[in-house]
């Protein structure tokens, strides 16, 4: 089977752009995927009570969004995998979509704590993993490359940059200077300046419909 898989993984079909962003994420993809994309770290495996308590919280979010991995409704599994004609579109409805947005909103703003340990989307730490976070255009492009399967238009990215990272200003140095000031002197005030904008940026990204696509 190795030659078959090798040919498949190197084929044009495997990398076809039409195969990206064509399915709605499962709740598991939404929850676990966002934790991985935001580089959320848990305690060492020896601290099982803390970890399992937090993992149970995230598991409950999957259930509330419509997917209980340990208890499928019947022998056929989850309807989104077989129910015609909707299939994966079943994952999104008037109840589940607000919960998806609520989950990422909570993870950005407060997160969850157990035994004195908090897990949260650390937006500043995430930005520091990017190649050029001081450049607002590169920051947006590289972040979207991680969060989204399909890119946004140049016009949309420009509006997002101006309204959020530049706080309504027109010049990139409003963000560049703020980031440089934090990097040179990470005081609480400088941290809050960049963190507030990054939290608003990522929360906006996570609430876009494009984020729901796999």
Per-range role (PLM):
Residues 5-214:
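Flexible, low-complexity segments enriched for small/polar residues
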């Amino acid at each position: 089977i190795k030659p078959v898989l090798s040919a498949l993984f190197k084929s044009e079909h495997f990398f076809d752009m039409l195969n990206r962003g064509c399915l709605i994420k499962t709740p598991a993809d939404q929850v676990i995927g966002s934790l991985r994309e935001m580089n959320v770290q848990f305690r060492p495996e020896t601290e099982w009570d803390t970890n399992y308590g937090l993992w149970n919280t995230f598991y409950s979010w999957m259930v509330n969004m419509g997917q209980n991995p340990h208890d499928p409704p019947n022998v056929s599994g989850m309807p989104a995998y077989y129910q015609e004609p909707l299939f994966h579109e079943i994952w999104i409805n008037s109840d589940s979509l607000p919960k998806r947005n609520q989950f990422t909103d909570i993870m950005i703003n407060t997160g969850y704590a157990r035994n004195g340990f908090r897990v949260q989307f650390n937006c500043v730490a995430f930005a520091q993993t990017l190649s050029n976070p001081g450049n607002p255009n590169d920051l947006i492009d590289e972040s979207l490359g991680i969060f989204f399967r399909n890119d946004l238009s140049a016009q949309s990215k420009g509006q997002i940059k101006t309204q959020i990272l530049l706080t309504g200003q027109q010049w990139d140095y409003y963000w560049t200077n703020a980031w440089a000031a934090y990097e040179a002197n990470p005081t609480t005030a400088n941290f809050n300046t960049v963190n507030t904008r990054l939290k608003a940026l990522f929360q906006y990204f996570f609430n876009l419909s494009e984020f729901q696509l796999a």
